[in-house]
Amino acid sequence: MNKFIVFEGIDGCGKTTQAKLIAEKLNAKFTFEPTDGKIGKSIREILSGSQCQKETLALLFAADRVEHVFNIEEDLKKSHVVSDRYVYSSIIYQISQGISKDFIYTINDYAKTPDLVVLLDVDLNEALKRMESREKEIFEKIEIQKKIKEGYYNLINSEDKKFMPKYGFIIVNTTSKSIHQVFDEILNAIIDKIPDIIQ
């Protein structure tokens, strides 16, 4: 049976690079949030500096995810699916903005629970160096990234079982490691959790 794997972590941790490499290794469909659909494009405009109420942005993310989940379900009929960000990003980032967890959970009730979540950790200063060449989004400030990092660990260590992945979480620290080293570490950890994932 095909698996749904999600990559999460703060900005600059190496999620996109590693998610693409793992997707390629597993012959999986690579996908991401926000998506490149109409709603996802609106979200990207807001993240780049357009003004919007935080609850409106949360609802847009949830709406984009409804479309995303439909596509994920279709793709899972044919192959594994690897996503760069998913509902956990919404939970962490939106709670950091002061939105209630109950509100976030309610509007994301439609979200499919993944089989496995890979959380990439990184030293904050190294993450900022990696992001220097990028256009800054509203969440890419060191104080916010520190809060986001704490949020991920709080979520993993909480008693809350909502959206708890079937095979749990894998945590890999990417600080001072090469792309190849991180890839090997992630792949070995995935195989440990799901031995039959590579046929």
Swiss-Prot record:
Keywords: ATP-binding, Kinase, Nucleotide biosynthesis, Nucleotide-binding, Transferase. The keyword Mitochondrion does not apply. ATP binds at residues 9-16. It is an enzyme of class 2 (transferase). One of its GO terms (cellular component) is cytoplasm. SUPFAM superfamilies: P-loop containing nucleoside triphosphate hydrolases (SSF52540). Pfam families: Thymidylate_kin. It catalyses: dTMP + ATP = dTDP + ADP. Its EC number is 2.7.4.9. InterPro entries: P-loop_NTPase (IPR027417), Thymidylate_kin-like_dom (IPR039430), Thymidylate_kinase (IPR018094). It comes from the Archaea. GO terms for molecular function: ATP binding; dTMP kinase activity. GO terms for biological process: dTDP biosynthetic process; dTTP biosynthetic process; dUDP biosynthetic process. HAMAP family: Thymidylate_kinase. NCBIfam families: DTMP_kinase. Belongs to the thymidylate kinase family. This is Probable thymidylate kinase. The gene is tmk.
